[in-house]
C-alpha cells in the first residue's frame, strides 16, 4: 500500500514549483490541492480525481479576503479528513498554512520547500511553517543562515 501524500500550494509560481515534483506522484497515493483560477482549471483534465481546488483569495480586497480565508479554512478541514495524508508537501503560500497546522495537530509529517524566488529573507509562510516542519528545504544555500535547521535541496527546477 502506497503512503498517502498531499501536495498543496497556492496558484502561480508556488504551484509551478510544486508540479516540478510530479515525478514523485507515481510513488505515492498522492493528491494535489491548489487555488482555483482560470490559469490552472485545465489541471482537472490532467489529474482528474487527484486534484481539488480551494478558493482563490487575494489580499487586495481585505474585507472579502477575510471571508474567503475563513471558507478556505473550513474546506481545509474537510479535505484533511477526507484525504488523511501521512505526509503534506508544500511550496507555500497562505493556502498551505492552515493545512500544515491541521496536519501537524493530527500527526501528518510536514515537508516545506521554501520558494526559489526568495534568496535572502523569510517568507510569511516560511516563518509560520518552519517551527512545525519535519523537513524544511531551501533552494538557496544562503537561506541556511536564515533557517539554520533547514536542508539545502538545490533548485527545484
Task: Put a short name on every predicted segment.
Residues 1-5:
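Extreme N-terminal starter segment of soluble prokaryotic enzymes
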Residues 108-157:
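Active-site-proximal region of nucleotide-activated glycan assembly enzymes
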Residues 91-95:
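Short His-centered aromatic/hydrophobic patch
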Residues 77-87, 97-111, 128:
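Glycosyltransferases and closely related glycan-assembly transferases
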Residues 62-86:
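An amphipathic, basic-hydrophobic alpha-helix
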Residues 14-26, 46:
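Short amphipathic alpha-helix
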Residues 9, 29-68, 142, 153-156:
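Conserved nucleotide-sugar phosphate-binding/catalytic loop shared by glycosyltransferases and other
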Amino acid at each position: 500500500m502506497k503512503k498517502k501524500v498531499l501536495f498543496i500550494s497556492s496558484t502561480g509560481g508556488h504551484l509551478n514549483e510544486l508540479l516540478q515534483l510530479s515525478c514523485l506522484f507515481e510513488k505515492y497515493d498522492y493528491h494535489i490541492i491548489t487555488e482555483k483560477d482560470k490559469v490552472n482549471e485545465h489541471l482537472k483534465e490532467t489529474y482528474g480525481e487527484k486534484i481539488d481546488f480551494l478558493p482563490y483569495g487575494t489580499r487586495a480586497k481585505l474585507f472579502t479576503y477575510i471571508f474567503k480565508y475563513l471558507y478556505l479554512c473550513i474546506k481545509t478541514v474537510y479535505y484533511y479528513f477526507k484525504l488523511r495524508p501521512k505526509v503534506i508537501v508544500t511550496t507555500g503560500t497562505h493556502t498551505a498554512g492552515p493545512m500544515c497546522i491541521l496536519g501537524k495537530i493530527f500527526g501528518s509529517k510536514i515537508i516545506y520547500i521554501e520558494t526559489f524566488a526568495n534568496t535572502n529573507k523569510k517568507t510569511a509562510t516560511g516563518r509560520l511553517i518552519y517551527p512545525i516542519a519535519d523537513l524544511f528545504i531551501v533552494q538557496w544555500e544562503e537561506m541556511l543562515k536564515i533557517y539554520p535547521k533547514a536542508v539545502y535541496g538545490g533548485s527545484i527546477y
